[in-house]
Amino acid sequence: MFAPLLKKLFGSKNERDVKRMAKAVQAINALEPQMVALSDEQLKAKTAEFQQRYAKGETLDQLLPEAFAVVREAGKRVMGMRHFDVQLIGGMTLHDGKIAEMRTGEGKTLVGTLPVYLNALSGKGVHVVTVNDYLARRDANWMRPLYEFLGLSVGVVTPFQPPEDKRAAYAADITYGTNNEFGFDYLRDNMAFSLDDKFQRELNFAVVDEVDSILIDEARTPLIISGQAEDSSELYIKINKLIPRLNRQVEEVEGKPTEEGHYSIDEKTRQVELNEQGHQFIEDLLSQNGLLGEGESLYSAHNLSLLTHVYAALRAHTLFHRNVEYIVQGDQILLIDEHTGRTMPGRRLSEGLHQAIEAKEGLPIQAESQTLASTTFQNYFRLYNKLAGMTGTADTEAFEFRQIYGLDVVVIPTHRPIARKDFNDLVYLTQEEKYAAIITDIKQCQALGRPILVGTASIESSEYVSKLLQEAGIEHKVLNAKYHEKEAEIIAQAGAPGSVTIATNMAGRGTDILLGGNWEVEVAALENPTEEQIAQIKAEWQKRHQQVIEAGGLHVIASERHESRRIDNQLRGRAGRQGDPGSSRFYLSLEDNLMRIFASDRVKNFMKALGMQSGEAIEHRMVTNAIEKAQRKVEGRNFDIRKQLLEFDDVANEQRKVIYHMRNTLLSAEDVGETIKEFREETLSATINQHIPPQSLPEQWDIEGLEAALYSDFAVRLPIQQWLDEDDKLYEETLRSKILEQIVAAYYEKEELAGAEALRAFEKQMLLRVLDDLWKDHLSTMDHLRHGIHLRGYAQKNPKQEYKRESFTLFQELLDSIKRDTIRVLSHVQVRREDPAEEEARLRREAEELAKRMQFQHAEAPSMEQAVAGEEEELPEGPAPVVPLEPVRNEQKIGRNEPCPCGSGKKYKHCHGQLD
């Protein structure tokens, strides 16, 4: 009740934040005359001065006014661009570790130079994260002259970069790259066999461009580095031939399924399920084709792999459509990013789904993959000491940014007022009527000389609109995943008078549409242009620019609403940049996916009750509210999926941190002899305890089994029964000591043969190899556990608690296996002299060969049904409270006698610190 009154008196939190920063802007402006008076050399010298002052104890906050004033002056001199006051506010927001929402055309790239320069003064490095390689290279090349003028180095990380170039890029003061490349390099670093092979330094400060795209849209899909597993391409081909014989279960008028058909599709959760009739039918088909034994069930334990293949093929045929979720290019399936409309080369679906799509399209089937390392963007970016982001649309997701990442959103005022007109949605009964209205609108705008941007949700839609325009004789350009190489050229002229551009999801394109076209692109197309030519091109552009402004600016037409309001807002934001005129209009129909799947029947019945005729549209607040409600419903569902993914990955993340810390400790250690000694004693103790239980009677001892186990684990044959027969004083403890002496003596014989230095190097490399192999298998086990854990809900158990409990048990077994397998390998190894450097070089060559075969994937996100199954009764009404997870600061070293952070109640040295 008091909230509106308090807001009126004190302003909103956003207004107070902006007001507070406006005072700092005044201080920066006051320094401007002083900076203008400096020579270039004096301005450059400021960087060294700031670095010295920082080293002596001044904070970055204290340096901020002067540093920002220096960057502003350098921008004027080097690039002819002066930071506006609102851009200074944006820079301060980023430095504070918050998200700056800035409208399209407000100069986000230039804003980033302020906090990037300031934080680079610490010498710890700054990462600037973009959504694609083109933008990473473009922004780095654009801003490089400014940074280098001020004495800072700039690097760019790209896929397939030579290791020495990538290492140099990470060593630079400022490093540009994509979220994928930064994430995969983090995983690669934790697979390295030498400290010299690692790329990244401490993760200090990251500025994420299009932060909503990276931290929200991409958060549902984990980053995975995988290697090849067994080949089962023939099975995919055989099962693929059977799937078309299955029929979808149809719905009656009331919406209830009939008995006819073999499977049902839930379009909301994108899941497909075989019904009872379908199970029987597919089992019969498999039996007839010799893939399933006579009378066997598809659900028998030994047939689960076959069941996985069946469901992968069924999903490939029913949920994945050519030119919507993927395109075929050559003999490859290229996935399409649902949020940006771009293809994702090298990205593959997991769990056999990609192979099933290849079989469906008749392409060569690539080998299946096994996870070698994985993480999520959520957990990767929380490793940075400080995280900030920029985007044109973050306010609709402010709740999620705060809940998941602990990041506040600050809406930065625009430099000029927004002059764009956003017209009401027009809703038609059918898609045919909707598209006819779109063509009419295009013709009217083109007659006025206005440029038009038509936004579609898929390649299929964009090509359909293109076909209609061709039939109407309207010249146009198409920008989608098939023609992305022409992107820069198409966008450059999308603002020319009367031009028509069709584009799939424009989110994350990162290029402004300039009214009248882009004169710089025209100049760049000329070889050695003269001053006269440049002046003529600029003059012609100025005429076109003015012509478009007078006609009303860019008109954005959207052919349907997206699942996210944010992507709709991004599309709208393409018009009306920097105070330019413009307009936007959404055309919808009841046959659109969003309306069909999520909008209520009440809306459909309401429209039909109005007696709408063919070609008529409706503009009504109730319809608009229903659409927004449907979008909020989808956004809420997707938020729940991302939250569930994070909660499950947090369990794996704690284990990941322990394993990666263990790896780094091993890589840094010159001698792992003490670690091997501890492993040997613990493994021996466990082996003896199995056959001679502590404080047991001699009659309970299994001496024969112990002798066999010692040979299996330690490669020594010991006559233990003979020792006991010959020595009556040989009790349990003295026997343990004697066995250990014999095992150690046998191992030292190998050391004498190989040499201490060579054996120490071999121990280190072998321990790393065993750790990596077992971690890889552990990841696979954890995947299987996660995919099936939702079924525990049917047994009235909490799936998340069960997952935590079982994953902890699995992790304890992993640590025991690392010790046991390392000792077993070292004990059985046949000694031959090999130079340690040669051994390391050989391992590095093997790692490089592995890297060539690696695949970098985004696995499919878990379905909503899996994520929340079995937990409905436990969830309170309203949004579940989430503890804010802030970006991880520098982690303090855990004392060996302190409680383990995993929550087991044990001391760290007896739990996850056993291998430190």
Swiss-Prot record:
Task: Give binding positions for ATP.
Answer: Q87, G105, E106, G107, K108, T109, D512
Can the keyword Membrane be found in this entry's annotation? yes
**Coiled-coil region(s):** none
Q: Which cofactor does it need?
A: Zn(2+)
Q: Which organism is it from?
A: Pseudomonas aeruginosa (strain UCBPP-PA14)
Binding of Zn(2+) occurs at C900, C902, C911, H912
User: What is the protein name stated in its UniProt record?
Assistant: Protein translocase subunit SecA
Which portions of the sequence form the region Disordered? 857-916
PANTHER family in the record: CHLOROPLAST PROTEIN-TRANSPORTING ATPASE, SECA INNER MEMBRANE COMPONENT OF SEC PROTEIN SECRETION SYSTEM
Q: Which GO terms describe its molecular function?
A: ATP binding; metal ion binding; protein-exporting ATPase activity
User: How does the UniProt record describe the way this protein sits in the membrane?
Assistant: Peripheral membrane protein
Task: Kindly list the GO CC terms recorded for this protein.
Answer: cell envelope Sec protein transport complex; cytosol; plasma membrane
Main localization category: membrane
Any keyword Transport?
Answer: yes
Of which family is this protein a member?
Belongs to the SecA family.
Q: Where in the cell is it found?
A: Cell inner membrane; Cytoplasm
Q: What are the GO BP annotations of this UniProt entry?
A: intracellular protein transmembrane transport; protein import; protein targeting; protein transport by the Sec complex
Keywords for the protein's UniProt record, in alphabetical order: ATP-binding, Cell inner membrane, Cell membrane, Cytoplasm, Membrane, Metal-binding, Nucleotide-binding, Protein transport, Translocase, Translocation, Transport, Zinc
What catalytic reaction does the record list? ATP + H2O + cellular proteinSide 1 = ADP + phosphate + cellular proteinSide 2
Subunit-structure text: Monomer and homodimer. Part of the essential Sec protein translocation apparatus which comprises SecA, SecYEG and auxiliary proteins SecDF-YajC and YidC.
